[in-house]
Amino acid sequence: SEPVQLPFIPHDDPRVIDSTGALDLTDIPERLLILGGGIIGLEMATVYRALGSTVTVVELADQLMPGADPDLVKPLADRLKKQGVSVHLKTKVTEARAGKQGIEVAFDGDSLPEATRYDRVLVAVGRAPNGAKIGAEKAGVAVTDRGFIGVDKQMRTNVPHIFAIGDIVGQPMLAHKAVHEAHVAAEAAHGEKAYFDVKQIPSVAYTDPEVAWAGLTEDQCKQQGIKYGKGVFPWAASGRAIANGRDEGFTKLIFDEETHRIIGGGIVGTHAGDLISEVCLAIEMGADAVDIGKTI
């Protein structure tokens, strides 16, 4: 896949960067505008604010990190605000022009940034698959108008001996999902009965604090009409978190009310990206919420 480019942004100007360019800067911009309040945008906001940049984040949706439950995102949003990151929700960029002193930007929405000139503009509004750019159709492989390649549960395309994995086969565009798909494809190609059939794919934002979730979110449960319960442990009740001076986080488990099986969970706090693996295992193994509650 490749970063999505916006037609009204001067992408030919070196001061306009994507996530790859943001990791390759030779200087620290004084004023950085980030278009997109998703995982990548917020990770870069965390990094560059720590390096001393004045950071502004603009997000079209009504919350940061769309797709995550709002309660998981709130501790991160509060800390970003405390650190001086300027966040503007339900707001979009309507125009950007390259000037001598910086990139001049015009906004529209509910929360307009005060600044209109920036030293760097990071475009982090998503990624697009490269299915239409690899000549797959020459081999008879079907490619959608958006550049995705359809596959079955064995990662086979419409041409049975050709497999596809990773960003090109659909969301979520995550490396660890692609690795699992590769295992399935390799085993299927070897003649084994392997299938991509998982109950969860973890997502992690390496921000400060980290945000991680797996399985179904509360919003997804509501949309699918699933009756669920949840258990939340505030890190303010954790001696270790208090000793570390980072007790703003919490751990949440979501379970099916009828079966008590764990179907989702989320963690916000330091090292959440490491801790989420336990939630992933609980979901895949069909762990019982009552059993977990009785575990010391």
Please state what every model-predicted region is.
Residues 68-79, 165-223:
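A conserved FAD-binding loop/helix module that cradles the flavin
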Residues 51-153, 216, 223, 227, ...:
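A Rossmann-like FAD-binding core segment of flavoenzymes
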Residues 4-7, 43, 48, 130-133, ...:
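Glycine/Thr-rich phosphate-binding loops of Rossmann-like dinucleotide-binding domains
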Residues 41-60, 82, 156-161, 169, ...:
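Active-site substrate-recognition segment that forms the wall
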Residues 190, 206-296:
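Flexible, glycine-rich terminal cap/loop adjacent to redox cofactors
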Residues 1-54, 58, 83, 87, ...:
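Glycine-rich dinucleotide-binding loop and its adjacent helix/turn
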Residues 2-4, 88, 142-143, 192-202, ...:
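A short alpha-helix-loop-beta-strand transition element characteristic
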Residues 12-29, 116-189, 196:
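FAD-site-proximal beta/loop scaffold in flavoenzymes
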